[in-house]
Amino acid sequence: MSRKKKSRKPGAAGAPEFVVTRNRTESDVEGRLRKRAKKRKGLKTGSRNSEVNEQKKQSSEQNRDPRLGSKKKIPLIVEPVKKMTKQERRLSAEQELEMLENDAQLNVLLDRIEAGENLGTGLQKYVDEKLDRIEKLMDQLGLLEPEEEEDFTASSAKGSRNDDDLLADFDDINFDDYKG
């Protein structure tokens, strides 16, 4: 019968729940593996020559003088910057408008606003800036229809009702309809 070793893990002395038993052969195998790992700590054999070649390549790159600079040619005459034509600016404005209209984040935020959700100040500011930019681009491209001004005369007529009319409306209200 082979010898059984008890583990040194702490536990209840009376009831050993986690007793690890090891055979002699398992311990021998583990010991051999540890010894083999200890023996092979150093570098690979025969790697001396290849390391020297690699170091020579690296040292030649490191010895390069940084003061020599680049061999890239630099133009001595400054060419004037070409201004965008009206047609190119119009195209870029159309592209920007298309990008803003297809902006996924802006569409999600607008959907949230339509649903009655209140956005934070940062998100609301973002939405306002984007909508203002869309309005400017549409105006620039001639796509924006001028807003029709509402007739303020009709609203001012309602607002100019005198106190007697308002009091008469209040007296005519039937409060029995609102009782639950």
Curated annotation (Swiss-Prot):
Basic and acidic residues bias: start-end ranges: 23-32, 51-68
Keywords, ordered alphabetically: GTPase activation, Ribosome biogenesis
Top-level taxon of the source organism: Bacteria
Extent of Basic residues compositional bias: 33-43
Entry GO MF terms: GTPase activator activity
Disordered: annotated segments: 1-87, 142-180
Keyword Nucleotide-binding among UniProt keywords: no
Biological process terms in GO annotation: ribosome biogenesis
Ranges annotated as biased composition (Acidic residues): 165-180
UniProt key word Endoplasmic reticulum: no
Pfam families linked to this entry: YihI
Described function: A GTPase-activating protein (GAP) that modifies Der/EngA GTPase function. May play a role in ribosome biogenesis.
Family: Belongs to the YihI family.
Subunit field text: Interacts with Der.
Name of the featured protein: Der GTPase-activating protein YihI
Taxonomic classification: Bacteria, Pseudomonadati, Pseudomonadota, Gammaproteobacteria, Vibrionales
